[in-house]
Structure formats: C-alpha cells, structure tokens
Amino acid sequence: MCKEVIMSQKIIDLVTAVVAPAIPDPYELVDIEYEKIGSDYILSVLIDKPGGITVEDTADLTEIISPLLDTIQPDPFPDQYMLEVSSPGLERPLKTKEALKNAVGQYINVSLYKAIDKIKIFQGDLLAFDGETLTIDYLDKTRHKTVEIPYQTVAKARLAVKL
C-alpha cells in the first residue's frame, strides 16, 4: 500500500473517532473520505437521515463538525483541506454489516477482492444477508442467476440505480 493511502486511512480513522460520537440523532454517519482532487484536499463527511437530508441539515452539521476537527492534536492534516458535508446520494456506500442488512431488497453493486466464477463485480438485487453471506440475484446476459458471496471477499458495496 502506498504511503499516501496509509496516511489518508489514518486521517479517516482519526476523524471518524472524533466526529461519529458528535453526530446527533436522527442523523447517521455514512462515510468519511479524504482525497486529493487536482491540487486540493477534500474531507467529505457523508451524512444521512430517514427521509434524506436538506441543505440546512448540512449547514447545521458543518457547524458541529468543523470546530471538532480543529481540536485534533497534533493536526493530522498535512495540507489545507476543504470540508464537505453532504448526502451520500443515490449510490450510497454500504460499508458495514448493518448497512448491508438494511439494504436487503434493494439493487446493489458489489466489487470483490477475488472473482467468483470469473466475475469480480456483481450488480443485482440483494435477496439476503445473514451477517456472513450476501445472496444476490443478478442478470447474466438474459438469465437471472443467484450468487452467494462471502462477506470477507467484498472489497466495496454500494446501492446502485437500476436502469
């Protein structure tokens, strides 16, 4: 793993530890991302709540989160960054077992560390998730197939838009 990826993950872990306990109900911390886009560093805090979040919600949450980031010592950020508090959008990441359990019945995209039947990316309806295995109904050309995917082989999962 390259040095920049390790540093980004350390920053994400530190920010998560500080920010997560401060997120009030009914909000949910969905994800934190720290990345360089062009010459700018962006710290994205993805928040959601039942019914979705509004622009006012993101402004209120920014007022909670921004001062907390200033309290982290020593300062973990190597350069100036922009704080972005936003909704995870339609294709929200599914990073926890709880998020996957809540996504049962929905259309998802799953990328794997290791291929199953020569396929590393599955997109289909999440039929079940028991905490260890995802069961997905996907389309192989014109035929529906079902695949069982061990949770530990999942590299990334997210909701997907069905076209």
Curated annotation (Swiss-Prot):
Cellular component (GO) terms are: cytosol
**What main location does UniProt list?**
cytoplasm
What biological-process terms (Gene Ontology) are attached? ribosomal small subunit assembly; translation
The family database entries (Pfam families) matched by this protein are listed as: DUF150_C, RimP_N
Q: Does the keyword Amino-acid biosynthesis apply?
A: no
PANTHER family registered for this protein in UniProt: RIBOSOME MATURATION FACTOR RIMP
Descriptive protein name: Ribosome maturation factor RimP
Which ranges form a coiled coil?
A: none
Subcellular localization(s) per the UniProt record: Cytoplasm
- Do the record's keywords include Cytoplasm? yes
As for what it does, the entry says:
Required for maturation of 30S ribosomal subunits.
Entry similarity comment: Belongs to the RimP family.
Q: Which SUPFAM superfamilies match?
A: YhbC-like, C-terminal domain (SSF74942), YhbC-like, N-terminal domain (SSF75420)
Q: Which CDD domains match?
A: YlxS_C
Q: Which UniProt keywords apply?
A: Cytoplasm, Ribosome biogenesis
